[in-house]
Amino acid sequence: YFVDWIVLNKHKKQCLPLIDLLIDGQREWDELLMISGNDLREGLHKMSRNFFRVRPWFEPGAWGGQWMKNHIQGLNKEVNNLAWSFELMVLENGLMLESDGYRLEVSFDFLMYSDYQNILGECSETFKYDFPIRFDFLDTFDGDNLSIQCHPRPRYIQEHFNMPFTQDETYYILDCKNSPCVYLGFQDNIVPEEFQYTLERSQQKATKVEIERFVQKHQAKKHDFFLIPNGTIHASGKDCVVLEISSAPYIFTFKMYDWIRMGLDGKPRPLNIQHGMNNLYFERKGEKVIQELICHPYIMKENQECTIEHLPTHKEHFYDVYRYTFKDRIQMNTENTCHVCMIVEGDSVCIETEDGMKQRFNYAETFVIPAAARSYTIINENPDKRIMLVKAFVKKEVTLK
């Protein structure tokens, strides 16, 4: 965890209106790029009224897979695997500004400091400069299971880590093969003390745990949607590509069992068994898991142009998810709410905003439509294939716990 980010971001906010010249220093000395402060602020404001996609980054991992290497252009093919793509984890992402073929990167924070009300709309005073929703990929294709883990309860993350809200997440199965699964919720006969003893003994003795004695294993298929509110035991199995949609407080995950494997550095990855035990809801077990933690989508609207489905999230989630299926085009209104979108089936779309700006977005690319965009059109660029798009947004009248 990088404490300097928090300190320097406060300074960055104060500096934004005073900047005369901003330099992108990620290049050789004779290739540095710069932008005037006025152009920077104008570009950010324009972005806040139309659309944006952050620059994602990709990272290998102990359980990483091969799907992203084979499906996303421009990635390093020499790495053994890719485990994560932080598609929209704004503490890690930058924004690219282009002029005359040159691309300059600035911190995402600048956009929120410049125009957070345009970005977030009706929930802007709830979240202020903290962008609330995160999209990322977990790739276990030809890889391995994720660690068995959970996320902190709201009060716990506030008291122990000084974060404004916690990570309530979901798994959307973008792709899968063979016999994919998701580990989610406890078996009906779970005994917390036995679970803790077994995990701690495994950590001390490096012995395997028969995890299905304690944790349910659910078969998964493409476009399934699993709900993982804070305090829920969970993990993705191998041979999945998971679009993880979650709230975005940063990196507070309590790993409790990691299959007795080594990290990329050849050492066991750190576990946080006691933190996990302090936060788990052991009542999320048995049939309750199927009823409350596996989403049951339903059709909200269906006509010749489009099918709109609601993918209800858990009551703990402050965001909701809709899914749109269409072949030609659809018109959207933001209703003063920020939309975070991804094409989960199809080739590409063209987004055209009320202000007349246009941009192509491809399959599996995350893009954001700010609340201030008001209305926009999504046009399928290959009508021979249908488009399936998921949209996440903050629920009405949200208050943070």
Regions found by a protein language model. Give the residues of each.
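Non-heme Fe(II)/2-oxoglutarate
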Residues: K238-V242, S246-L271, Y298-K301, N336-T337, ...
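Short acidic-glycine-tyrosine-enriched beta hairpin
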Residues: V215-F226, T353-A372
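Ligand-binding loop in jelly-roll beta-barrel domains
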Residues: T140-N145, C176-S179, T232-I251, A371-V398
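Loop-centered beta-sheet repeat module
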Residues: A206-W259
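Transition-metal
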Residues: F2-I6, H11, C15-E193, D258-P297, ...
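Acidic/His-leaning functional-site neighborhoods
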Residues: C295-E365
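Glycine- and acidic-residue-biased ligand/ion/polar-headgroup-sensing regions
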Residues: D142-D144, D168-E169, I173-S202, D239, ...
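Tight coil/turn sites that cap or link beta-strands
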Residues: R153, P229-G231, D239, F326-R329, ...
